[in-house]
Amino acid sequence: MMTEAKPQTVHAAFRQAAARWPERPFLAVLPETAERYGIEAGEITYAAAAETVERLSVGWAKAGFGRGHRVALLTENRPIYFLTWFALNRLGISVVPINPDLRSAELEYLIGHSEIAAAVVL
């Protein structure tokens, strides 16, 4: 009996799950969440998530980002946070999550010391 190879990265684990369960839900967006962020409510399947992750990672790569870069994410708890995180991870980019509740001094310190090359803010 053959077993699947153990994924070596978070993105590899995601891709393995997406290949195994493409039509299963990956994320669920509740109506309250959808209303708050102006996005569509419902489920995002692994297949749809994998397609978005691929498209986002291609865009980041074309923009010159790759292994060794750091990108800050300030997107609150939206689906795009997770999709962008997987896209960046695919390229070896480190994610610097930013809590939207940080005070200005905390935010200044985090940005000043994390050596980010870009930030995604929504």
Name each model-derived stretch.
Residues 6, 23, 27-78, 82-86, ...:
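Conserved AMP-binding/adenylate-forming core of the ANL superfamily
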Residues 1-12:
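Flexible, non-catalytic linker and terminal segments flanking ANL/adenylate-forming cores
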